[in-house]
UniProtKB/Swiss-Prot annotation:
The keyword Translocase does not apply. It is found in: Virion. GO terms for cellular component: virion component. The gene is A. This is Maturation protein A2. Belongs to the Leviviricetes maturation protein family.
Amino acid sequence: MPRLPRALRFGPNMEVLSDFQELWYPESIIDSDVKYPLYTFRGSIGGSFFDSYGTNNIVREIRRTPHCATVPIASSGLRPCTSVWYDPTSLLFRIPEMRAEWDNGMGDAGDIVYKDFLFSTPAPKEFDFSNSLAPRYSNAFSAFNAKYGVIIGEGHETLKYFALLLRRLHKAVRAVRHGDLRGLRKILDSYNKGRWKPATAGNLWLEFRYGLTPLFHDIKSVMDDWNRINDKIQKLRRFSVGHGEDFKLSIDGLYPGLTHFRLSGEITVQRRHRWGITYANREGYATFDNGSIRPVSDWKELANAFINPGEVAWELTPYSFIVDWFINVGDIIEQQKQWYQNIDIVDGYQRRDIRMRSVSLKGVRNGIPVRVTGSVELVDSFYNRSHTTRIPQATLAIDTSFSSIKHVMDSISLITQRIKR
């Protein structure tokens, strides 16, 4: 019998199958091979030429998985998701070629070219962006586009607001048609009880953002629900979302071969998190259950998920949208209590990795800046992909940064509104 590559096995009819135990739970191996043990530097200092080398004193240790082969699954024709990781103790960088030039006077002039110089930084691999991914899963697999519980809860105020908009629009059209600028001014002044003040612009912005825009979205969502074709064909689909954020690493105290010459700078890396699943639609509806989608048939549980009283209560709480800027309460309530499409997740993965975005290098010679040109490449990065059949779950987190210019404008409008009072 021929020997198969790692992670493959023979089936009962001698067909070649994937060994899922090996693919999903592989054993690690430690890689500590030395790369680029030496670096070279050549050039001149003070008129003296030299050609020398130095030792890259880097301790390299990577915990990684061995290469595994896969074959497509007969029932779907898709290759299975596998667990793979490449986990170094630190990020390893290489300067393929760098040139340092200076002329500080008093005979202190130099022109040096370095090749294959290595340095390392701590690996910022403890990150998880599930809170950014979870809302996108909630939206993608929600049974309905519209939030009917919230629409019902806000129904009375919505009708009053809609009637007010129609009256204002009718009066404004009449004023423009008849060239009545004074009448149009009165309509605008009605936002602030007769006099135009700076706060009026803020009132108009808030009314547009949290009155008119959600109303149009609700109308569109209801229409989408009515027009949706409920496709329950038993075929596999794929879905994935990702999120990335920049992270800055400082470089300092690097002395490549020469005394009184120091390298420093900053490297920007991007930490990325992606979550993907392979699934099939099933009949019925479901709810969220600790990272999984659980089918539901009990009418009381279905009614509770349809109305989602927790989300309704939160949406009707004054200024809850401001809390959601900083604490993801709304995302958690929406994910855990809403009504989902019933799907069967047959395969999936979550992947975290680090990529280099940009680098800036600076040189210092005897306390004086030195012109440095060259490139940097990432030799050992971080990569972790693990098999899963769950979906990302939102957990309580605090975010003190404004995520968009709209939040800044909302804040200015609210502040001017409070000052006016």
